[in-house]
């Protein structure tokens, strides 16, 4: 009698471990800030007006949007799951459930090079989620932003009933 071979389905969380660390680095430039302002509609002088910042700010230069830094946090969270999402036989897939305790600690100036660090802190298989500490540092090693990222491992997406 022929035996039917079946691959056991695994959770993506089986490949996520506390302490795993991922990086994303980028120099924040004019194009990043201008495109982000256009996409979001946030045309604050602090982001787009050189003269205003020279005259009114002790920084003397424009700064990146804080929400742009959250976008870079999202990039590094995507990098963190790249080794998992295309494995065969997964019973679930990752969905960002959000960021807690987001803090902008220092300004990011145009021309700064930031590195987003993503370190898995909690793997909770019972609740189907992982939590990572995210820290963004500039080229001088100064922490400019922090957050906790929650990644939910969903069996299936569904729309909320109305």
Describe each PLM feature range:
Residues 2-21, 104-162:
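HotDog/MaoC-like acyl-thioester-processing domains
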């Amino acid at each position: 009698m022929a035996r039917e071979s079946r691959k056991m389905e695994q959770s993506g969380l089986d490949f996520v471990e506390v302490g795993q660390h991922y990086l994303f680095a980028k120099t924040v430039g004019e194009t990043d800030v201008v495109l982000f302002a256009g996409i979001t509609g946030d045309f604050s002088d602090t982001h787009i007006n050189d003269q205003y910042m020279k005259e009114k700010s002790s920084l003397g230069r424009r700064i990146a949007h804080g929400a742009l830094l959250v976008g870079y946090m999202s990039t590094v969270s995507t990098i963190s799951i790249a080794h998992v999402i295309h494995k065969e036989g997964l019973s679930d897939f990752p969905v960002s459930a959000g960021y807690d305790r987001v803090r902008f600690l220092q300004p990011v100036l145009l021309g700064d090079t930031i590195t987003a660090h993503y370190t898995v802190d909690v793997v909770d298989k019972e609740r189907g989620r992982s939590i990572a500490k995210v820290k963004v540092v500039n080229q001088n090693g100064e922490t400019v932003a922090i957050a906790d990222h929650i990644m939910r491992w969903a069996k299936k997406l569904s729309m909320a009933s109305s």
